Structures are given as structure tokens and as C-alpha cells.
Amino acid sequence: MKASDVRAFTADQLKDELAKLKKEQFNLRFQKATGQLEKSSRINEVRKDIARVKTIARQKAAEVKA
């Protein structure tokens, strides 16, 4: 997911996307623990996507306050 794609989201969409990514991260961690994970790089991708969404959400919140 690119940052430019995330910037187009509304605040509600950002919250939904964050919840979806956290759920996916949980499932990936569970798969890793049980030895069923095929693409271990996906864990890092999801982690970075979560950081991207959180960062842009903070930036949008700061713009509203300013």
C-alpha cells in the first residue's frame, strides 16, 4: 500500500483500514506460531502499512487542529 493511496482515505476509512491491518497482523502471527506461514515477508509489509496509516491519521488530525 502506498502512502499516496492512504492519504486519499477519510478519517473513518483510516480507522477501518487500521483495524483490518491489525486483524491481519494477528492472523499472520498466529500462522507463524503454528508453522503455517508461507510468506514471512508479509508480516513486515503489514507492520509498515500499520505505521503508514497511523502516521497519516496523525498528520490529518494535526491539520484539523491547526
Swiss-Prot record:
GO terms for cellular component: cytosolic large ribosomal subunit. One of its GO terms (molecular function) is structural constituent of ribosome. Signal peptide: none annotated. The keyword Ribonucleoprotein applies. One of its GO terms (biological process) is translation. Keywords: Ribonucleoprotein, Ribosomal protein. Pfam families: Ribosomal_L29 (PF00831). The keyword Ribosomal protein applies. It comes from the Bacteria. PANTHER family: 60S RIBOSOMAL PROTEIN L35/50S RIBOSOMAL PROTEIN L29, LARGE RIBOSOMAL SUBUNIT PROTEIN UL29C. Belongs to the universal ribosomal protein uL29 family. This is Large ribosomal subunit protein uL29. The gene is rpmC.
